[in-house]
């Protein structure tokens, strides 16, 4: 389905920055920085009709302090290409300001070679589209951050977690080095986590229900676990400082996840 620019802009308004907290008059007089998320369904906001499916972007604010806001613009089914072609990156870049962050995680849908509206080739068009995010953020005084795609739940017969993203993570790593962009290697970190948890325990992190066995999307514990990886890497890669993060070693109750009603 094609979207008009008006429809894209209207949809993007639903992704307004979520304030993590409001404290003190000093903070009220100083604009807080915003971390914008661009990505696919693994990060996107989910609504009541999709529960218990949860995007990791819904849980990220639990690990960031009040001086940061999160604006989750990730959308189900998008690739680095279709997000640009639909005008969604333009909407983000119109809102982003100096000192903000643009976190970019695409790959799941870039892999769909049968769909020309989404497919990108890892070492050419994928990198070309990612450069548009990097260049757009830098041109506006914001800091781009690339994140390799979180891994799906897939194990071989011997119980080994199997990578599913082909050359896309390597292509992003190479681009990050070439462009001197901070890289969060969520693909490597998540597959290591799934390996530690094992075949059965990982089912508790993905959207396995009585009617569905979804090995791509998360439930609340899975989204919280991936968001914790993202926040820890933002600190480790010196994108954020210790004063910007919280709860990295603390339990976050899954009851904190809520699903609003979808906008009409």
Regions found by a protein language model. Name each.
Residues 35-37, 41-44, 64-66, 73-79, ...:
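Cell-envelope and extracellular/periplasmic
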Residues 88-220, 224, 229-246, 258-262:
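Alpha-helical cap/lid subdomain in secreted, periplasmic
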């Amino acid at each position: 389905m094609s979207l008009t620019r008006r429809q894209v802009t209207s949809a993007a308004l639903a992704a307004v920055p979520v304030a993590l907290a409001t404290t003190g008059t000093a903070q009220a007089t100083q604009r807080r920085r915003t971390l914008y998320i661009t990505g696919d369904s693994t990060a996107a906001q989910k609504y009541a009709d999709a529960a218990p499916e949860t995007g990791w972007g819904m849980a990220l604010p639990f690990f960031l302090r009040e001086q940061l806001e999160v604006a989750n613009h990730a959308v189900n089914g998008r690739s680095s290409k279709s997000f640009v072609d639909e005008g969604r990156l333009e909407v983000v870049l119109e809102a982003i300001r100096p000192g903000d962050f643009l976190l970019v995680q695409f790959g799941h849908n870039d892999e769909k070679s049968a769909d020309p509206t989404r497919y990108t080739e890892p070492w050419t068009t994928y990198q070309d589209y990612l450069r548009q995010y990097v260049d757009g953020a830098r041109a506006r005084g914001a800091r781009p951050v690339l994140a390799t795609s979180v891994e799906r739940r897939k194990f071989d017969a011997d119980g080994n977690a199997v990578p599913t993203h082909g050359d896309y993570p390597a292509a992003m790593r190479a681009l990050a080095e070439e462009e001197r962009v901070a890289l969060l290697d969520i693909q490597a970190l998540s597959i290591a986590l799934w390996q530690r948890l094992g075949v059965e325990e990982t089912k508790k992190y993905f959207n396995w229900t009585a009617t569905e066995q979804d090995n791509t999307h998360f439930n609340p514990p899975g989204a919280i676990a991936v968001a914790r990886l993202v926040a820890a890497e933002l600190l480790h890669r010196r994108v954020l400082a210790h004063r910007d993060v919280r709860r990295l070693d603390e339990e976050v109750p899954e009851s904190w996840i809520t699903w609003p009603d979808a906008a009409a």
